[in-house]
Amino acid sequence: GGFDEAFLELPGEVLARTMIHHQHFFPVAARQNGLAPSFLAVTNTAPENAERVSRNAERVLAARLRDARFFWEADRKVPLELRFERLATVLFHKRLGSYREKSDRMEELAGWIARDVLGRDDARADARSAARLAKADLATEMVGEFAELQGVMGGIYAREQQLPEPVWQAIYHHYLPVSPEPTAAPAKADLGAGAVTWAAVALADKLDTIVGLFCAGERPTGSRDPFGLRRQAHGVFRIL
């Protein structure tokens, strides 16, 4: 099936997540960069029903993409700094406060890591800025609907606001790595000049989560790790 080319104005990440995670479709890559206005779907219906199935799939996808476009346009009207202020109403943990409080801790920690651990005082300001805004997209419409895009949308919105590349790249990638696999961390080529900034912010986020939740009594057990602390610890080791 296909969809209106006007939707190609949406970030490719939004298009792909909508098709893959929400509709279970396969996006189609364009000959050059980006996606084509087409998708593939698998069905177990009789071949004579293929055209009707395709039309229904196009209709459902178009509705999802219209929603995504609405969120995209609405979110860009509000700067990330204002979204950051709204994090005061988003709870991180009952004993550790809001995501605004977590962001404040991350800002201080990321600056210290960049300067005193990684030895890059020149990256300290960018690390602090990125850490401050890293969770701001949790207060956006897009992430409210597409939770799997958290971090990614923050980076995209930061890029739209023309924040420095090391800042938006660090925000975009700060949840990574999410597994111990060698390919789980972003490649240095993708991070460019922002590799140190990303490392400082990602470490600050993971260390704040691990230490804070251990202090709050949320230690993982052999059968229970609801906050993914083992995964966070693996992430710290992969970054280092």
Residue spans for each PLM region:
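Amphipathic alpha-helical "coupling" segments that flank catalytic cores
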Residues: 1-240
